[in-house]
Regions:
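Conserved ABC ATPase signature
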Residues: 134-138, 142
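Conserved catalytic motifs of ABC-family nucleotide-binding domains
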Residues: 155
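Helix-to-loop junction immediately C-terminal to a conserved catalytic motif
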Residues: 48
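Catalytic Walker B motif of ABC-type/P-loop ATPase nucleotide-binding domains
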Residues: 159-162
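Short coil-to-helix segment of the ABC ATPase nucleotide-binding domain corresponding to the Q-loop/switch region
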Residues: 92-101
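Conserved ABC ATPase "signature" region
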Residues: 63-64, 111-129
Length: 258
């Protein structure tokens, strides 16, 4: 289980996370939704120790990673896999080298076993016999799947997905959604997904959490979020142009324009 308590982070005068509270149950996929610039990516970076928050706790199975030194953090990070928004493949490496990158860097297995793991993980995401292709030869959906194969290559028990369906057509987005569900069911990973794609969120989530003004303002199952009575959440999930989110933005613009 991941327990985030009182998490705060600011950049200069801008408060991004403001006493955020969130519990991520073990073996479940918690999807964090929210508008652009609301701090979703900052939350994930804090969760893996890439950003140090100003206050709060992030406990993974009871251990607070914020108070760990760098050596302890390196050990904990081995439990994480991450699918980046743009897949973040190394352009100078072929597909096989990309998937094997962490395994070789951490010297996890003998070379023969690394090759077997690469083949296995690529098969899990529906890609066979493409190890020698370069990233430039892949479609957007293939890049995402290679990125996912790399994320699971080290057998993590926690997976982080940063906007996994962004930039994909609806069919390929649904392929990625199905892979996320399959991984949760077959290897039992605990997952945090950040997205503003509500179709994806409703399909893959066990729980959905809405991030707004640096706080989680509502957590619920997909059905509970669909029928929310919170006007902020309701405006966001229904994609309405008018409501408290946009009304507040318009009021701010009028104020600074005086």
């Amino acid at each position: 289980m991941i327990a985030i308590r009182g998490l705060s982070k600011r950049f200069g005068k801008k408060v991004v996370l403001d006493g955020l509270e969130l519990t991520v149950p073990k073996g479940k996929n918690t999807v964090v939704i929210g508008g652009s610039g609301t701090g979703k990516s900052v939350l994930i970076k804090c969760a893996v120790g890439l950003l140090r928050p100003d206050a709060g706790e992030i406990r993974i199975d009871g251990q607070d990673i914020i108070r760990m030194d760098e050596r302890e953090l390196v050990r904990v990070r081995r439990r994480f896999g991450m699918l980046f928004q743009g897949a973040a493949l190394f352009d100078s490496m072929d597909v096989g080298e990309n998937v094997a990158f962490v395994l070789r860097r951490l010297k996890m297995y003998p070379e023969r076993q690394i090759r077997e793991v690469v083949e296995e993980k690529l098969s899990m995401v529906g890609l066979r016999d493409i190890q020698r292709l370069m990233p430039a030869e892949l479609s957007g959906g293939m890049k995402k799947r290679v990125g996912l194969a790399r994320a699971i290559a080290s057998e993590p028990d926690i997976l982080l997905y940063d906007e996994p369906t962004t930039g994909l057509d609806p069919i390929m987005a649904d392929v990625i959604n199905d892979l996320i569900i399959s991984l949760r069911e077959t290897i039992g990973v605990t997952s945090i997904t950040i997205t503003h794609d509500m179709a994806s969120a409703y399909k893959i989530a066990d729980h959905i959490a809405m991030l707004y003004k640096g706080k989680i303002i509502e957590v619920g199952t997909p059905d509970q979020i669909r029928t929310t009575s919170n006007p902020v959440v309701e405006q966001f999930v229904r994609g309405r142009a008018h409501g408290p989110i946009t009304d507040e933005s318009e009021e701010f613009v009028r104020f600074v324009s005086r």
